[in-house]
C-alpha cells in the first residue's frame, strides 16, 4: 500500500525539515504580530506609513491563505485519486508498478482545458503523453528540442507504441501567437514562446496565403488544424518513426478538440493527411 499522503508530503515533497518548517511558521506569525503591535503602539505613525503596514499585513495573511488552499487542493486531490481509483483498481496498478505498455504516444497542448486523459478518457498506462505550447512536434534535430526527440524515441523505440496522435484544440493561445507574428517584424521580448511556435510557421504561411480574406479568428481556427498537419509531417523526419510507418506497425493521426462545441475531429496520415472522421 502506498504511504499516507501526510508522510509523502513531509518526506518526499518538502524542501525543508519539520523543524525548519515550524521555525518558518513561527517567524511568519511573529512578523504579523510585530506589524500589528507597531500599529497599536505607535499612534504617531504617519498616515502613509500606517497604510503601508496595514497593506503589508493583509498581503502576508492573503499569501498564507493562498498557500494553505493550494496544499489542501493537492492533498484532497490525491486522497480522492487514491480512494476512488488506486485502491479500487489494485490489479491495474500492481501491473503498472512492474511495467508500462501504452498503445499511444499523444502530443497535446499545455492548455489547462485540454488534458487528453479527460477528453479521450485515457486510463493509467494507456498513453505516453507529451504536452507543450500549441502541441508542436519539431523536426528531427539532435541539437535542438531534445526533450521532444527523447520522448518520441522512447515511445517508439522502447515502448513500441502503435499510434501517435497529435491533438490541436479550439481557442489555442499558441496558435494565436503564431498567427500574430508579422513578416520581417522585430523579435518580441519573449524568451521562448515566439521561437517555439515558429515550428508551425509553414502552417501560418499557408493559411495566410490561402485564406487571406478570412478574419483573424477564422484564420486561427484553420491554423489550429494545419499546424497539427505540420507536426505530423515533422514526425516523419524522425528515422525511427518513418521506419515503423513504412513497416505499417505505427499509425500517425491528427486530432482537433473543440471545447466550445464539444466535438472531436480525427484524421489519419496517408502522406496527404486527409480528414476521415468527425465526432459530436
Swiss-Prot record:
Pfam families: Pro_CA (PF00484). It is an enzyme of class 4 (lyase). The keyword Oxidoreductase does not apply. It is found in: Cell membrane. The keyword Lyase applies. InterPro entries: Beta_CA_cladeB, Carbonic_anhydrase, Carbonic_anhydrase_CS, Carbonic_anhydrase_sf. GO terms for cellular component: chloroplast envelope; cytosol; mitochondrion; plasma membrane. Residues 47-76 form a coiled coil. Disruption phenotype: In plants lacking both BCA1 and BCA4, impaired CO(2)-regulation of stomatal movements associated with reduced beta carbonic anhydrase activity in guard cells, and increased stomatal density. It catalyses: hydrogencarbonate + H(+) = CO2 + H2O. The modification S-nitrosocysteine is found at residue 223. Interacts with DTX56. Belongs to the beta-class carbonic anhydrase family. This is Beta carbonic anhydrase 4. The gene is BCA4.
Amino acid at each position: 500500500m502506498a504511504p499516507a499522503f501526510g508522510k509523502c508530503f513531509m518526506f518526499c515533497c518538502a524542501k525543508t525539515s519539520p523543524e525548519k518548517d515550524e521555525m518558518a511558521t513561527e517567524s511568519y506569525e511573529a512578523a504579523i504580530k510585530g506589524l500589528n503591535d507597531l500599529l497599536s503602539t505607535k499612534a504617531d505613525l504617519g498616515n502613509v506609513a500606517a497604510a503601508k503596514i496595514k497593506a503589508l499585513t493583509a498581503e502576508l495573511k492573503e499569501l498564507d491563505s493562498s498557500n494553505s488552499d493550494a496544499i489542501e487542493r493537492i492533498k484532497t486531490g490525491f486522497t480522492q485519486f487514491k480512494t476512488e481509483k488506486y485502491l479500487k483498481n489494485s490489479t491495474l496498478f500492481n501491473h503498472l508498478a512492474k511495467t508500462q505498455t501504452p498503445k499511444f504516444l499523444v502530443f497535446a497542448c499545455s492548455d489547462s482545458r485540454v488534458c487528453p486523459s479527460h477528453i479521450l478518457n485515457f486510463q493509467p498506462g494507456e498513453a505516453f503523453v507529451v504536452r507543450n505550447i500549441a502541441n508542436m512536434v519539431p523536426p528531427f534535430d539532435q541539437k535542438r528540442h531534445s526533450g521532444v526527440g527523447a520522448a518520441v524515441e522512447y515511445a517508439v523505440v522502447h515502448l513500441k507504441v502503435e499510434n501517435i496522435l497529435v491533438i490541436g484544440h479550439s481557442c489555442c493561445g499558441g496558435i494565436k501567437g503564431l498567427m500574430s507574428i508579422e513578416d520581417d517584424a522585430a523579435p518580441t521580448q519573449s524568451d521562448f514562446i515566439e521561437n517555439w511556435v515558429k515550428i508551425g510557421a509553414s502552417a501560418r504561411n499557408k493559411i495566410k496565403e490561402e485564406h487571406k480574406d478570412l478574419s483573424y479568428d477564422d484564420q486561427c481556427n484553420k491554423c489550429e488544424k494545419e499546424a497539427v498537419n505540420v507536426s505530423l509531417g515533422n514526425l516523419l523526419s524522425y528515422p525511427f518513426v518513418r521506419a515503423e510507418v513504412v513497416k505499417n506497425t505505427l499509425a500517425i493521426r491528427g486530432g482537433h478538440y473543440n471545447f466550445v462545441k464539444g466535438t472531436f475531429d480525427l484524421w489519419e496520415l496517408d502522406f496527404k493527411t486527409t480528414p476521415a472522421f468527425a465526432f459530436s
